[in-house]
Amino acid sequence: MITASTSVFGGLILAFIFSLLYKNKKTRIPAEIDRVRTGGFLAHIRAFGCRLGTRVDDIRNGYNKFNKNGKPFVIQDSTFIPQVVIPPQYLGWLKEQPEKALSAETVRLEQLGLRYLVPSSDPEMVHLLTDVVCRYLTRNFQRVQERLYEELHMSTDEIMGLEATEWRQICLHEAMETILRRMISCVLIGLPWCRDEECLKSWTGFLHCMAIAGTILGAVTPWFLRPLLGLLLKPPVGYMRRRSLRYLTPIFTERWKKIEKHEKSSLTTRELPDDFVTWCIQEVRNGAAEVTMLDLLSADPTIGYWEKLVEEATTAFRTDEDWIHAGTVSKLAYTDSAIRESLRRNPFSIRNVTREVIGKDGLTLPSGTRLPQGTWITTALANIHHDARFYSNPTEYQPFRFVARDAFHTEGKEGSEKVLQPSEAILTSTIDERLLTFGYGRRACPGRWFASHILKMLIAYITINYDIQPLTGPPKKVKFADFTVPSPSIKIIVRRKNLAYLRQRER
């Protein structure tokens, strides 16, 4: 029988063990670096016991108090991993550090839980896939553009409807996820698998399972408990992985055989499937769509943001011929700016550009402070995106902030002209020290060009072909640990534009 005294005694033993683990961990951050919370080990205990939202407040307070003055600070959270948040001024220095000094790979293995959920994962495979994306996908937009448009056209019409006489309610999260999943799949695995619902469900189910388990392990669980919790989470992840491989393995096998025939000159290049699987063998999401749509639909409808995007899209895409030319997407400057602004206002995580000091001798910060091996370095992503030093009126939604024009003129509610001053012409896919959604430096997201490309296609197609009722209030969000995403239950009301309008557009 477990008594109160037994529980207290057991708790004291656990606290003692955790304290020993904490003290024996090789990494001890120098005392001269400022702390948001004081108390060492007890600060981590409080972070673990308090609601997870407190880390948002800690990082915001540390950014305002220290980072804005050019000083790094220490953040203590439930993971018990020593982390130093560097100011924006240090990003140039971080970018120049070699991989042997600062590693993004070791952080990725911990943050995604891969070390415990998929211990057989090969780091070389990650480098390989990155190379495939950089060398093939970003250079072959035109070769996949027609397929992208076909999937966009078919999936959007199927989900949002073709009926122009009545409004219908749809779940925004499900709609965006399904459309983007099919567009991405047509490049990843090609036809007919990209339209096979069971195939799509198998690998997206595996990704969802990995995301949930990885978040629990990497963002919440103390580092010394991860091996134990990983043993409990590994079986369901392994099951979903095997389920997805039942579909994907035959696809890779088929491509491998065709490539072998091609290398023996019995198969022409035109006959060779042109998709991501083929590129992988030869070389061997984000919710961005949702937050962009939600920002546009919750903005003041009298300002005319949506109408401007409709005008831009209808000018660029007059016929189906325009859709199958990848270069047409580059004309969507206002759409690109709207996506970038939503990524600025709604970062997926409060931290990014995280690296681990792996050199045996540690690493010296620009301030002269030396960090020991094992320290994590990160940036206050959300706070940088809302810093008035980098953005005028940072809390205000300005979807055309990044358009290369002197000003965007609109009519306010009272009829007076309102002028929104954009910063400068910067594409969504551009890596910039003020916008870190896609990372920074050599380890920035290699698929950002493709992501930006399909997002602009999706928003353009919807604005051209559908009317959507504005939202009545700010959209709900779900927060957990470092992450914030739109509520998956948000509904929008849509209606297909009538044929007369669409025919008039094509003239």
From Swiss-Prot:
Enzyme's top EC category: oxidoreductase
Location, primary (coarse class): membrane
EC identifiers of the protein: 1.-.-.-
Pathway membership: Secondary metabolite biosynthesis
Entry-linked PROSITE patterns: CYTOCHROME_P450 (PS00086)
Membrane-spanning segments: 1-21, 205-225
Subcellular location: Membrane
Pfam hit, one: p450
Domain of life: Eukaryota
GO cellular component: membrane
Keywords linked to the UniProt accession: Glycoprotein, Heme, Iron, Membrane, Metal-binding, Monooxygenase, Oxidoreductase, Transmembrane, Transmembrane helix
GO-annotated molecular function: heme binding; iron ion binding; monooxygenase activity; oxidoreductase activity, acting on paired donors, with incorporation or reduction of molecular oxygen
Family the entry assigns: Belongs to the cytochrome P450 family.
Job description of the protein: Cytochrome P450 monooxygenase; part of the gene cluster that mediates the biosynthesis of the indole diterpenes nodulisporic acids (NA). Nodulisporic acid A (NAA) and its chemically modified derivatives are of particular significance because of their highly potent insecticidal activity against blood-feeding arthropods and lack of observable adverse effects on mammals, in particular the tremogenicity associated with the paspaline-derived IDTs is not observed.
Protein name as annotated: Cytochrome P450 monooxygenase nodZ
Upper lineage: Eukaryota, Fungi, Dikarya, Ascomycota, Pezizomycotina
